[in-house]
Structures are given as structure tokens and as C-alpha cells.
């Protein structure tokens, strides 16, 4: 018979999952294990001097409930199959269940964060708005992961504001 994990036991289990990257436990909102690259693998795919040359293997995301934070690094190959897999890394139900282990009668802060290709999005709110927060988080995650490098790099980042056209001078 599975026992309910409450109080300090839940925090200790969450702390262990945060660092050991184990698959989603009874308190974790994540349903996939951590897939962090090794140091050597990370260095092969990331340029420390020029972030524009980065070729990340995946993305980082986290859920926080008060002082408890769950983090994951998930691999993402920018394919349709990979997108569907990582979009299922957590669900509204798994987030609600994990949050219920840490939420008492008082409202606490809840935060979702995702970082991919140098872009970071953080959404936060109170525990009473958790359902709305998880809906916003899944939309943000889907939009961020579906952006192509062309969309991320706008005309402004290339030094030419949008709407400005270049004209050749006619010589007489």
C-alpha cells in the first residue's frame, strides 16, 4: 500500500528528485526523466564565446511551488515527433497533483520557467491561479519550441528595423 508523502518527507523527496534527475516521483510534476547532457557533450554543442553559435541538445524547464523547485533538461531535436514527446513532459493534472503536496491553506507562489536557445520565459502566480498558470505555461512552451531560428532572429536583430527597405541610388 502506497503511503501519502506529506510535510518534510515530501520536501526531502522533492529535493532528491531536483538534483538526481530521477523520473517523476509521487511529488514531481514531470513525467519524463532528466536528460541533461554530460559536460563533454555540452561543450561539443555550445560555444562559450558566441551564443549565436549554440546548437543546444534540448531545453530546460522547471516548476516551483513555494520553496520547492523541480527542474528538468529535456532533449529536443526540433522534429514533430520530438515536439509531441516533450510537450507531454507534464500535464495540468500532474502539476496540480504535485502542487497539492506542497500547498496548504495559505496561498503560495507557483512558477513555471522554460529556457531554449537563449530565450527564457517565466510565468508565475499564486496557488489559487494554478489551473490558469498551467494553461499559459503549455501555450508558452509550445510557441517557444515551435519557433524556427528565422522567427527568433528578427530584422531588428540583424541591424535592420522592420519596414525599412534598402534603395539603390541611381547614378546619372
Curated annotation (Swiss-Prot):
Belongs to the tombusvirus protein p19 family. It comes from Tomato bushy stunt virus (strain A23) (TBSV). It holds the Pfam family Tombus_P19. Homodimer. Keywords: Host-virus interaction, Inhibition of host innate immune response by virus, RNA-binding, Suppressor of RNA silencing, Viral immunoevasion. GO terms for cellular component: virion component. It comes from the Viruses. Residues 1-38 are annotated as: Disordered. Residues 1-15 have a biased composition (Basic and acidic residues). Viral suppressor of RNA silencing which binds specifically to silencing RNAs (siRNAs). Acts as a molecular caliper to specifically select siRNAs based on the length of the duplex region of the RNA. GO terms for biological process: symbiont-mediated suppression of host innate immune response. This is RNA silencing suppressor p19. GO terms for molecular function: RNA binding. Gene3D superfamilies: RNA silencing suppressor P19.
Amino acid at each position: 500500500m502506497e503511503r501519502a508523502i506529506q510535510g518534510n518527507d515530501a520536501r526531502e523527496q522533492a529535493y532528491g528528485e531536483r538534483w538526481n534527475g530521477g523520473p517523476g516521483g509521487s511529488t514531481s510534476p514531470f513525467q519524463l526523466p532528466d536528460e541533461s547532457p554530460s559536460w563533454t557533450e555540452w561543450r561539443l554543442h555550445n560555444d562559450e564565446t558566441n551564443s549565436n553559435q549554440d546548437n543546444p541538445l534540448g531545453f530546460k524547464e522547471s516548476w516551483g511551488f513555494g520553496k520547492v523547485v523541480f527542474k528538468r533538461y529535456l532533449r529536443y531535436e526540433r522534429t514533430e515527433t520530438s515536439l509531441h514527446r516533450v510537450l507531454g513532459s507534464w500535464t495540468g493534472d500532474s502539476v496540480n497533483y504535485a502542487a497539492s503536496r506542497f500547498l496548504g491553506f495559505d496561498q503560495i507562489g507557483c512558477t513555471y520557467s522554460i529556457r531554449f536557445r537563449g530565450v527564457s520565459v517565466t510565468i508565475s502566480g499564486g496557488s489559487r491561479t494554478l489551473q490558469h498558470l498551467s494553461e499559459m505555461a503549455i501555450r508558452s512552451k509550445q510557441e517557444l519550441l515551435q519557433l524556427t531560428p528565422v522567427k527568433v532572429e528578427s530584422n531588428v536583430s540583424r541591424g535592420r528595423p522592420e519596414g525599412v527597405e534598402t534603395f539603390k541610388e541611381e547614378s546619372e
